[in-house]
Design a protein with these regions (language model features):
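An accessory alpha-helical subdomain
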Residues: 68-163
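Rossmann-fold dinucleotide-binding core
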Residues: 3-68
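Short linear Ser/Thr-Pro motifs
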Residues: 2-3, 107
Length: 163
């Protein structure tokens, strides 16, 4: 999957012959987000083993598509993606388990949450599994989320005890 960088970059370095040039890329959008055009959408790149000339050519090519080309290491990508894409997919899949539906009382916030459910569950389930399994930082994200839920639940419990 494009959504994880460290694992596939390590595999490419280990398995590909040195004559093969490799660049790790991640368009930070899918079909839903890019359906109206690519302009301004983030596109991450890291040079795994490409020659400088090849690397520059691809950077220029993707830049010419008017995407926001972000050059960052695979490690930095996975760190940031765990807390952006990873948590979004985790929350979306978790909310989907609640089988929430439409309601006439839906606030804008609720509609936004339902949009997250729709967007993340529209992606293949394997993408979710890969994000959670192969990104070395998503476990830390999930543990942080669990801790935040516990803290919030405890704060509510304290407020209930005041009554």
């Amino acid at each position: 999957t494009c959504s994880v960088k460290l694992y596939p970059a390590r595999v490419m370095k280990r398995l590909l012959p040195p004559t093969i040039q490799a660049i790790a890329t991640h368009p930070m959008f899918g079909p839903d987000s890019g359906k109206d055009g690519l302009e301004g959408l983030p596109f991450v790149m890291d040079n795994v083993s490409a020659h400088e000339e090849t690397w520059r050519w691809w950077v220029d090519e993707f830049t010419s598509w008017k995407m926001d080309v972000l050059m960052m290491s695979c490690d930095q990508h996975d760190r940031e993606a765990a807390w952006s894409q990873g948590i979004t997919h985790f929350i979306g899949r978790t909310l989907a388990e609640l089988n929430l539906g439409s309601t006439r009382l839906a606030t804008k916030g609720y509609q936004t949450l339902m949009g997250v459910v729709e967007q993340t569950c529209n992606d293949p389930l394997q993408l979710f599994y890969d994000l959670q399994r192969y990104n070395p930082y998503t476990k830390q994200m999930r543990m942080g989320l669990r801790g935040a839920l516990v803290t919030t639940m405890e704060a509510l419990k304290e407020q209930e005890e005041i009554l």
